[in-house]
Design a protein with these regions (language model features):
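Glycine- and aromatic-enriched mobile tails/lids
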Residues: 5-7, 16, 24, 28, ...
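Catalytic-site beta-strand/loop segments enriched in glycine and acidic/polar residues
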Residues: 9-15, 169-196, 351-365
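Conserved N-terminal glycine-rich FAD pyrophosphate-binding loop of Rossmann-like flavoproteins
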Residues: 38-68, 231-233
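FAD-site-proximal beta/loop scaffold in flavoenzymes
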Residues: 146-164, 169, 318-360
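Short beta-strand "acidic-cap" motif of Rossmann-like dinucleotide-binding folds
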Residues: 31-36, 212
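Conserved redox-cofactor binding core of oxidoreductases
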Residues: 42, 92-166, 171-174, 178, ...
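An anion/pyrophosphate-binding glycine-rich loop and adjacent beta-alpha core
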Residues: 202, 208-322, 375, 384-391
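Dinucleotide-binding Rossmann-like beta1-alpha1 core, especially the glycine-rich loop
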Residues: 68-91
Length: 529
């Protein structure tokens, strides 16, 4: 027996974009439900973000913010979206204080959070609390696997409660997708393992178009010591320290990287340079070195506290005494659903916001822009969904969910088959090795073949426990997202921003256009430019 959740607006995802959309819709006087496949506000990219918002605040002008964003995005961004983003960003970021978010204001943005590796909790925790206080219905531990359509319109969704072990059917007049990106498709990532690209798949199968899926951003400097967490390293440690190969060569100097701060303005170039050094044999077990000994001698710990897990580096790794290993890590997806300035995807009833959307960041993202993005377009998508919910009537959706519920039942009853964790592990290995920072035609073809093989395995997985069921239901959606990344990377025969092909190493003005993905009649993935 399925549980029913009815609302005017359904928001899928409880990261910053989803929470902001839910608050905006609720404040406009409509009934709102928000669903998360984990505890609300947890296991999303917002939580592990560095806590920095870049916006037109304290001296940075909207025009400067617009120009920087377009430049870093290699002008593949949608200029209309970027203009709104730059002009509204400052006000929207400061507005978070109204929802209980504490922040430190500085030139060009704000910073939040106090836990070095989980600064984003300073965003999601108070916003979840605010959602509950204003009457948003919060549904937790439910993985949504399909959007329900009546005719051309999205009228709800269906998912599975992995704690209780029952289907959940959502009826709504409008849906906001805010499921985040797909960083967990890669072996090395700072994203939680639940960031598996669900929204790309959900939107795609509901008829939405996607763009820029080939552009996956890798943070260039993250801890790569054996057995240690892959913490991001930035700030003074990377700007004032030395990033070295085994020959003692300074890698940024060797590759002529001068834009500063490196990890904000040159993420793609530095990531590529590090991986080239590793590929050429000038690394250490898949890593290079950061020598921050002089930094720790000159700077006090309080100054360095915002640059990464300083206490961990000093006490566990003895970073004041010797260099430590680092390597790039998958951090963000620039591509996603095509939307207009109000979060509308072109599918009636379906809106989107946050990392699941493409167009704002173009070919590469400027550091600090992701969190500003979720506030600006989360609010806009929530407002648009609320407006639609006032002018349409609710539809009965139970019959629309029947086929998906039967799929859950078959999966739960299967007593032999493949382990879903193995499917996801193989996918992450393939994406890291074949569709990561340095790509070419051959490696992408190998990644595509692996995805094809894994699809067959994913159809025959078994899931005897709730957590197994979660991974089993994530796997087909993750494979959709992975195929989009690989297919788009195969299509774009140039190098631009975060997309680098060693067989097409130069930027080509003919490719100053997005690769668009849609589902063709019969279910095939269709690409156009």
């Amino acid at each position: 027996m399925a549980r029913s959740v009815d609302s005017d607006v359904l928001v899928i995802g409880t990261g910053g974009a989803g929470l902001r959309a839910a608050i905006e819709a609720k404040e406009r006087g409509v009934g709102v439900a928000i669903v998360s496949k984990s505890p609300a506000g947890m296991n999303n990219a917002t939580v592990v973000a560095g806590g920095g918002f870049r916006a037109a605040i304290e001296g940075l002008t909207p025009e400067e913010h617009y120009r920087d964003t377009m430049e870093v995005g290699k002008r593949l961004n949608d200029p209309k979206l970027v203009r709104i983003f730059a002009e509204e960003g400052g006000e929207r970021v400061l507005e978070l204080r109204r929802f209980g978010v504490e922040m430190r204001v500085h030139h060009g943005g704000v910073s939040v959070g106090t836990i070095p590796t989980l600064r984003g909790l300073g965003i999601t925790k108070p916003m979840v609390k605010h959602c509950r206080s204003i009457g948003v219905e919060v549904v937790e531990n439910v993985v949504v696997t399909k959007l329900l359509k009546k005719g051309e319109a999205v009228v709800g969704a269906v998912g599975y409660d992995v704690h209780v072990g029952e289907p959940v059917v959502f009826s709504s007049k409008a849906v906001v997708l805010a499921t985040g990106g797909a960083g967990a498709l890669y072996k090395r990532t700072d994203c939680p393992l639940r960031v598996t690209g669900d929204g790309y798949s959900l939107g795609y199968h509901a008829g939405a178009r996607l763009r820029d899926m080939e552009f996956v951003q890798f943070f260039p400097i993250a801890l790569a010591e054996p057995g240690e967490p892959p913490f991001l390293i930035g700030g003074a440690i990377t700007e004032e320290g030395r990033i070295l190969n085994t020959l003692g060569e300074d890698i940024p100097k060797k590759y002529g990287l001068t834009a500063r701060p490196l990890v904000l303005k040159s993420r793609d170039l530095l990531s590529r340079a590090v991986m080239m050094e590793i590929a050429q044999g000038s690394g250490v077990s898949g890593a290079v070195l950061v020598d921050a000994r002089e930094v720790f001698r000159r700077r006090n710990v309080e100054y360095l506290a915002y640059t990464g897990p300083v206490k961990y580096l000093l006490e566990k790794l003895k970073a004041a005494e010797k260099p430590f290993r680092v390597a790039p890590i998958c951090h963000f997806c620039m591509g996603g659903l095509v939307m207009d300035e109000n979060g509308y995807t072109g599918v009636p009833g379906l809106y989107a916001a946050g990392e699941v959307v493409g167009g704002v960041h173009g070919a590469n993202r400027h550091g600090g822009n992701a969190l500003t993005d979720i506030t600006v377009f989360g609010a806009r998508a929530g407002a648009s969904a609320a407006r639609r919910s006032r002018r349409v009537k609710a539809k009965r959706v139970e019959e629309l969910a029947e086929a998906e519920i039967r799929r859950y039942e078959v999966l739960a009853a299967r007593d032999n088959g493949y382990n879903p964790y193995i499917v996801m592990e193989r996918l992450r290995e393939a994406m890291w090795a074949k569709a990561g920072i340095i790509r070419d035609s051959a490696s992408l073809a190998e990644a595509f073949e692996e995805i094809f093989d894994l699809r067959g395995m994913a159809e025959r997985v078994m899931a005897s426990r709730g957590r197994d069921m979660l991974v089993a239901l994530e796997a087909p959606m993750a494979l959709d997202a992975a195929e989009m990344i690989v297919r788009a990377a195969m299509e774009r025969r140039e190098s631009r921003g975060a997309h680098y092909r060693s067989d097409y190493p130069l930027e080509d003005q003919k490719w100053l256009k997005p690769v668009i993905i849609s589902e063709a009649d019969g279910g095939a993935m269709h690409l156009t430019t």
